[in-house]
């Protein structure tokens, strides 16, 4: 997805990845004025046919073998999801080592479900089994796993239920820990959590930036998924702190580049 004002979707992910030294080929699924959560938005959804055409163009251009990772976010419709899934298959055919990372955007605790119900089944039956990594928030983790997610322990149980469908790694955000929040990584080799203070800010897109940073670190010099977890959480928390301090309505990506500044908060992932 893409917005003209603010930093969500590709407007949140492209710049951090480029700043980390990665070439990025954004494929938009919507073009909006700003995040709908702020109200009064205008724009349009990109058709499944147009998404397919862009992905086909990349294939014809002969660049897919250079694709080291795919990061999928907002789909909005099952037809678009099917077009994206076809793109995943083309990338994997060109580069079997490419990482497929999927942020299963369905909703959140504040707004509930904000996509068509049919997308839940699409993720469960098609996208999640085909992905290597997924990035659900607490609401999405509970919805997709069928488990009540109320703390780190229950998040791990829910993540393992989702992993039984195929992905090797689940990274859950916004998991409650008393008055704090945890980001929990569950993989086939272990579980880790990073706990951060809860901040009050209206900004959108923190999850999008986090997913991009984690993928960027894994493709870069982070030697483990857990190291990438700690770095990505630290960077995003720093952005949210600055947004809260300055009473901003959008993430200040233009002002404070993640993955570059010395973090105010540098938590070490806790091995569970």
Mark where each language-model region is.
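Conserved N-terminal subdomain of the carbohydrate kinase-like
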Residues: 1-109, 255-272
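Glycine-rich beta-alpha junction loops
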Residues: 3, 30-32, 76, 106-108, ...
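Short acidic, glycine/serine/threonine-rich loops at helix termini
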Residues: 9-11, 38, 111-114, 181-185, ...
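Residue-level signal for inorganic ion chemistry
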Residues: 70, 137, 207
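Conserved phosphate/ATP/ADP-binding segment of small-molecule kinases
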Residues: 113-192, 199-201, 221-226
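Short glycine/threonine-rich catalytic loop with a Thr-x-Gly-x-Asp
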Residues: 196-214, 228
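Short glycine/serine- and small hydrophobic-enriched flexible loop segments
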Residues: 212-220, 234, 238
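Charged C-terminal helix
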Residues: 226-272
